[in-house]
A protein has these predicted regions:
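ATP-dependent carboxylate activation and anion-phosphoryl transfer catalytic cores
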Residues: 1, 5, 15-17, 22-314, ...
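ATP-binding N-terminal substructure of ATP-dependent carboxylate-amine bond-forming enzymes
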Residues: 1, 234, 352-355, 361-418
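Short glycine-rich anion-binding loops that position phosphate/pyrophosphate groups of nucleotides
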Residues: 12-13, 142, 403-404
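Extended, domain-scale alpha-helical bundle/helix-rich regions
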Residues: 329-332, 338, 342
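Short, basic interhelical loop/turn and adjoining N-cap
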Residues: 291-300, 341-352
Length: 418
């Protein structure tokens, strides 16, 4: 009965390998055969397509008594149709109403209670913003990629707490800082966390740079900032691809608006860099939303960055920006190196001037739940540095692998544990 309409083929594999979207009988036969071959249980699911809906996730922890808490609400900025492992994500949810979040939480609790999980579970939903309909995409009753993101975003040690719950403790028996015990925990950080995937298409000759229901990312980065713009630009710099901002990537700035919009019609690893140049060439928020189904809020934030960049280049090419404009650029996440590149002045001149103005990053702690005096820190130009440094003790530096090129993502990354 679904033949003739868009369908989604899903199999029992990690990262959606073997599945895909199909649009006719021939594609249905091909993808089903591929999915059956890849599936660990010799089955595939044939489901209606919910392409373009909002993809939303909750990380829920449950104990043996049936007590439940939500550790984190995660909004996928890319719509359904792009695998969540490839999708750009934010925590907390930035455009979803409290009413919808409460609805998702109620449904997630019913699901987790029904399967009687003890520990952490990731529940993924699709939400149609037009009709309000909600469907469950999948659940992961284990420590997943999203669990790792939720843990780092909130300071809540999901794996540790899951182990404690599995040993027989309950949430109301585990101490948790200002909340007293874990059963009273609510996510309440005053910062924004973004996850951006890292791909390596350049290492696989002949592989098309196209994103869909099969995961293509080989790693990811996570950034923390006080605003979306600040966190967004920090994420781009963390990719270790010698990109210090969103503009002037590859030859996208040489292409016409029409060419860029044609490229945006198919999701790719360069989607947000193409979007940035399309906005520079005059594409409207509505045009880009129609092609990508990325919500207006996120496109508008990017448009404001484009306008700010164009204003800086027009007014200050060959010189350091005026004090107020330089400060605003730093608040919005522009790096010294990127400002140096677009303005044609030395990076040192920009850094010297902003330091003279007192425009320097402050450091703030994300406190780890359930432990005393334990935190990790993020930098922001929106805060004053009030984190004291104790130089009386020896220190240890742990180096992680960065955004992994080939190999494990954060979900399977064991190298930082020991």
């Amino acid at each position: 009965s679904l033949v003739g309409s868009e369908m989604c083929i899903r199999d029992s594999t990690m990262g959606g390998a073997g599945g895909g979207l199909v649009y006719n009988k021939e594609e249905l036969k091909t993808v089903c055969a591929r999915g059956l071959q890849a599936s660990l249980v010799g089955q595939v699911l044939v489901e209606e397509s919910i392409l373009g809906w909002e993809e939303l996730e909750l990380e829920v922890v449950r104990d043996a008594k049936g007590n439940m808490i939500t550790v984190c609400f995660i909004e996928n900025i890319d719509p359904v149709g792009v695998h969540t492992g490839d999708s750009f994500c934010s925590a907390p949810m930035l455009t979803i109403s409290e009413e919808v979040q409460k609805k998702l939480q109620d449904q997630a609790y019913r699901i987790v209670d029904a399967i009687e999980v003890i520990g952490g579970t990731n529940v993924q939903f699709a939400h149609d913003p037009i009709s309000g309909r909600v469907v469950v995409i999948e659940i992961n009753p284990r420590t997943s990629r999203s669990s790792a993101l939720a843990s780092k975003a909130t300071g809540f040690p999901i794996a540790l707490v899951s182990a404690m719950l599995a040993s027989g403790l309950t949430l109301d028996e585990i101490p948790c800082g200002k909340y007293g015990t874990l059963d009273k925990y609510v996510p309440d950080g005053d910062y924004i966390v973004l996850k951006f995937a890292r791909w390596a298409f350049e290492k696989f000759k002949g592989v098309e740079d196209k994103l869909g229901t099969q995961m293509r990312a080989v790693g990811e980065v996570m950034s923390i900032g006080k605003t979306y713009k600040e966190a967004f630009q920090k994420a781009i710099r963390s990719l270790e691809k010698s990109r210090y901002g969103l503009g002037h990537v590859k030859d996208f700035d040489q292409k016409s608006k029409k060419e860029l919009l044609t490229m945006l019609a198919t999701p790719s690893s360069e989607r947000y860099f193409i979007m940035y140049e399309a906005l520079r060439k005059g594409a409207s928020v509505e045009e880009i939303n129609k092609l990508t189904k990325v919500k207006d809020y996120f496109i508008e934030q990017m448009k404001e960055l484009v306008e700010e960049e164009e204003k800086l280049v027009a007014a200050y090419h060959g010189q350091v920006p005026a004090d107020a404009d330089l400060k605003q650029a730093k608040l919005d996440g522009f790096s010294d190196k990127y400002l140096s590149q677009i303005l044609g002045v030395s990076e040192e001149a920009i850094r010297t001037r902003r330091t003279e103005l007192g425009v320097v990053e402050g450091w703030e702690g994300v406190h780890v739940s359930g432990t005393e005096d334990s935190a990790y820190y993020y930098s922001s130009y929106h805060i004053k540095d009030e984190s004291p440094v104790d130089n009386s003790k020896q220190k240890v530096m742990i180096l992680g692998g960065g955004p992994n090129r080939i190999g494990q993502g954060i979900e399977f990354d064991y190298c930082c544990v020991h």
